[in-house]
Swiss-Prot record:
Domain of life: Bacteria
Principal subcellular localisation of the protein: cytoplasm
Entry protein name: Phosphoglycerate kinase
Residues annotated as binding ATP: 202, 325, 355-358
GO-annotated cellular components: cytosol
Enzyme Commission code(s) on record: 2.7.2.3
Gene coding for it: pgk
Reaction it catalyzes: (2R)-3-phosphoglycerate + ATP = (2R)-3-phospho-glyceroyl phosphate + ADP
PANTHER family reported for this sequence: PHOSPHOGLYCERATE KINASE, PHOSPHOGLYCERATE KINASE 1, CHLOROPLASTIC-RELATED
Positions bound to substrate: 22-24, 37, 60-63, 119, 152
Amino acid sequence: MIQLRQLSDVIVKDKVVLLRLDLNIPQEGGKITDNTRIVRTIPTIKYLILHGAKVVIISHLGNPKGRIELTLSLRSVVTELEALLNIKVQFCPESIGATPKNAIINMKAGEVLLLENLRFNSGEELNDATFINELGSSGDIYVNDAFSCSHRKHASICGLPTKLPSAAGFLLLSELKHLTSIFSNANKPFTVIIGGAKMSTKLDLLNSLITKADYLIVAGAMANIFLAMKRFNIGASLYKPELINVASLILKKATSTNCKIILPFDAVIQNFNSNNITILELNSSLVMQSNAKIMDIGPQTIAQIINIIKISKTVVWNGPVGAFEQTPFDYGSTYLSKAIAEKTRTGSLCSIAGGGDTISAIKKSGVIDDFSYISTGGGAFLEWLQGKTLPGVEALMQKFRYS
């Protein structure tokens, strides 16, 4: 098991604790639509409050690319934090400079201050030394409880541990413990479902999982690459032509292992001119109109995947299989969520899901509590699946080794 300094290893009373969370949560019209990542960090915040720390929360929201965008202000999460913690949460409209320094100086033990979006400053994503020094100058201790950001080499993830005594929060430790245990002892048949729209990073994942999984189920925009490679007419469906050669190599590699790659047999198609919705079989004779897109997997595909789930002992899921935010394109993700949850409840399946959209899709299906483990990580979850060491975790490990 990875060795990291824990909260119980540091004295936080009357100390300024810079607590890195992932508050990059889905919102619509300024309203939070899924608070999972906040809820999972509450035990760490409450521990620090109870032990008399001055808790300074730092995070990012969206990708403003070093510019101030009011629609991406972290002020929007203050009310949710206050409701979950049942205390007043102060907000500072800046992350570095005199304003946050003064706000921190005036804090009392047990109080919570949220700084503005770190990515309003370009130094965050550049892991800039000046930004790191400025951000860390008011802190006594650094705590990382943002597993879902720990794959990024950013200032608040990799830089601050080089400047301050550092520890891992409860959520980060929980993620590492559960994921390490699950993937080192995965019972077979081992099935992986990969969907969503982030194609290039997930192709790397598919390539690494071919030697580990018994079934690789590919859906969403990921599947479109393979369908295009087979020269199927997929209309205006999202895919990246430059990735077709990589997909071809993955299929060839899979033939030399016992891994079966499962692609959709049929799909739900929407014509964006007429809004007409049809279900079509995906084959070489398919002719889709240029203004039509694949929006979800079809009933034959759903049935086949459910049959695979029924014989599986471990299922890992990352990425919705359709545009689940819209009805009726949520059927695929909903049926799979319920099938996985049903078998998990019997005790005969270990089910793990990760990624913001995946969590939202499962939550929408009403069965999120029935999964064995829900990871808050998206990109971090993918990199961990590939066996990579996360930069944020490595930074904490280095601090533990040499402190």
